[in-house]
């Protein structure tokens, strides 16, 4: 029986140190599913593990891509599963760690695959949105995929106010002639491993304090210079992220440096709240306080593997 020990939790909670301790305990590798840490040009602002940490266990999917490459969650799923198959042939226990819930889910449950849509369809939808606003997209989705519209309305109503998501739903409907919901993964994907999910949590005040400290450390380590180097490419998808966006606004003279740093802290706190919301929905997670003794966590994992 293969086991994938998956460590989840918000940013700055201590997932890296726990994953390394477990990798040493089980003599195995670590798969990173932190989508911000894939890119080699973004090191400080994404809190990539230090060289010392990376030397303590073999890590995969850290700084292995360039911001100039298009890399999707579907690509990651394929590559991660291929890598896990290879690793499981040597050791039946492996570790996955990261704060990107969508990417973790893709490995654990499979990712919905959508056909490519012609760019001109997207352009037309964009024009309609520019002219008629979000109501146009809401009406269109209700008309083209009533089932999915109702599902969003009942489960996640704020999505109806998100133009990017709504345009995506409508373009899939118009580009394929089928409802968006027909492409969602209805079949249970079977994996060749059993998952043990360990979640780390802390009180909000502690979390926020850790985030503020981490941002200060990033600034001291040279985040400003890293962002400045990336500034000419600021419109790339990979760079539309906390820690860089705010400094680009400083370079644009929209923010003072102090204000940009405060915005990074505020937006990272918001990001961590969204992570917590996502992870709290993850079934069968065994939650531990961020200061929990590693030996206790190992004990629980070993018990799970015996059953």
Curated annotation (Swiss-Prot):
For this protein, the Enzyme Commission number is 2.5.1.75
InterPro entries the record matches: Dimethylallyltransferase, IPT, P-loop_NTPase
User: Which stretches does the entry tag as region Interaction with substrate tRNA?
Assistant: 34-37, 164-168
Q: Which cofactor does it need?
A: Mg(2+)
Residues reported in the UniProt entry to bind ATP:
9-16
| Record GO terms (molecular function) | ATP binding; tRNA dimethylallyltransferase activity
The chemistry this enzyme catalyses reads:
adenosine(37) in tRNA + dimethylallyl diphosphate = N(6)-dimethylallyladenosine(37) in tRNA + diphosphate
Q: What quaternary structure, including any partners, is listed in this protein's UniProt entry?
A: Monomer.
Function (record text) = Catalyzes the transfer of a dimethylallyl group onto the adenine at position 37 in tRNAs that read codons beginning with uridine, leading to the formation of N6-(dimethylallyl)adenosine (i(6)A).
The name under which this protein is listed is: tRNA dimethylallyltransferase
Ranked from the top, the taxonomy reads: Bacteria, Pseudomonadati, Bacteroidota, Flavobacteriia, Flavobacteriales
């Amino acid at each position: 029986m293969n086991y994938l020990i998956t460590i989840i939790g918000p940013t700055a909670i201590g997932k890296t140190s726990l994953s390394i301790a477990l990798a040493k305990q089980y003599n195995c590798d670590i798969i990173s599913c932190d989508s911000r840490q894939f890119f080699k040009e973004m090191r400080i602002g994404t809190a990539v593990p230090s060289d010392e940490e990376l030397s303590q266990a073999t890590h995969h999917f850290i700084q292995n891509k360039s911001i100039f490459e298009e890399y999707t969650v579907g690509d990651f799923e394929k590559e991660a599963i291929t890598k896990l198959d290879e690793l499981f042939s040597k050791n039946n226990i492996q570790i996955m760690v990261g704060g990107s819930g969508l990417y973790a889910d893709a490995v654990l449950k499979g990712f919905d695959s959508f056909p490519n849509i012609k760019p001109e369809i997207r352009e037309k939808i964009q024009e309609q949105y520019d002219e008629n606003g979000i109501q146009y997209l809401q009406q269109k989705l209700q008309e083209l995929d009533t089932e999915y519209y109702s599902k969003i309305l009942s489960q996640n109503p704020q999505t109806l106010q998100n133009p990017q998501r709504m345009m995506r739903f409508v373009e899939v409907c118009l580009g394929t002639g089928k409802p968006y919901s027909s492409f969602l993964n209805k079949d249970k994907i079977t994996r060749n491993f059993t998952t043990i999910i360990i979640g780390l949590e802390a009180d909000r005040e502690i979390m926020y304090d850790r985030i503020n400290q981490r941002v200060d450390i990033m600034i001291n380590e040279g985040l400003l210079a890293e962002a400045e180097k990336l500034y000419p490419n600021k419109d790339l998808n990979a760079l539309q992220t906390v820690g860089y966006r705010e400094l680009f606004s400083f370079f644009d003279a929209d923010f003072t440096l102090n204000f940009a740093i405060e915005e990074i802290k505020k937006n990272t706190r918001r990001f961590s709240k969204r992570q917590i919301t996502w992870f709290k929905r993850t079934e069968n997670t065994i939650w531990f306080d961020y200061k929990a003794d590693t030996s206790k966590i190992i004990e629980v994992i070993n018990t799970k593997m015996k059953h």
